Amino acid sequence: MKKILMVFVLCCTGMLSGCLYPKEKVQQNVVPYEEQLQAVQTAVNTYREQNGNILPIKTRDMNTPIYQKYPIDFQKITPRLMQEPPGNAFESGGIYQYVLVDVETNPTVKLIDVRMAEQIRDLKLKLQIYRDEHQYPPFKKVITDGVYELDYKKMGYKEIPQVESPYSGKNLPFVIDEKGEIYIDYRIDLYDMLQKYGDEVKEGEDIRQLFVKHTPFVPVYSLPYTVKNKEPIFFK
């Protein structure tokens, strides 16, 4: 009887472990752990030292936006310099792409939330369907010179599409430029950043650097911004 009871307990424990593991795995895949960033940074630094200043990055077209231009190639650093990519890396089924910024002077590891790319892709698809029939995008309002708000009702949306900010968790809107390219509007988050770090930037400078300097994330799919009267504005 005791033996049967022991087997039953072990089975239950195994079942519970099986139930808990996926939840833990999911959490591991979405949280930008500082230790994971540091582990990748250490591996990148070591690779660079061992390979004459060459960085472990994938090749991208020269026209690739700067924050997406230098994705880390984990095949070059695993398993020799780290056992495997972090659990939250896209290569491991996570939601973050690991990239490098400041590659010329101080290569630094940062993150891109790949879910943002998926939402941009969906919006571009609906925009293309609309343009196939009407030729021009459904502009609703001019935000500033060359930057516009879209009329989403004309595109078939019941609600205004937004994307969750990796910085604040707030919902951020989209904008479109005169070329028909879709971007995320980060002004809400930049306003908050200026409240904290406004003395670090001045009018005429691209203030997206505040995101790069003070957070783990790069402002992907963004237009340049500067500051005027202590508020963020689009900058050309």
Model-derived features with residue positions:
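Bacterial signal peptide processing site
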Residues: L20-K23
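Juxtamembrane membrane-water interface segments immediately C-terminal to a transmembrane helix
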Residues: Q27-E34, Q38
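Extracellular/periplasmic head regions of type IV pilus-like filament subunits
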Residues: I57-R131, P138-K236
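N-terminal alpha-helical signal peptides/signal-anchor transmembrane segments
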Residues: Q36-G52
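C-terminal motif of bacterial Sec signal peptides marking the signal peptidase cleavage site
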Residues: M15-G18
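Positively charged n-region of N-terminal signal peptides that target proteins for export
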Residues: M1-L5
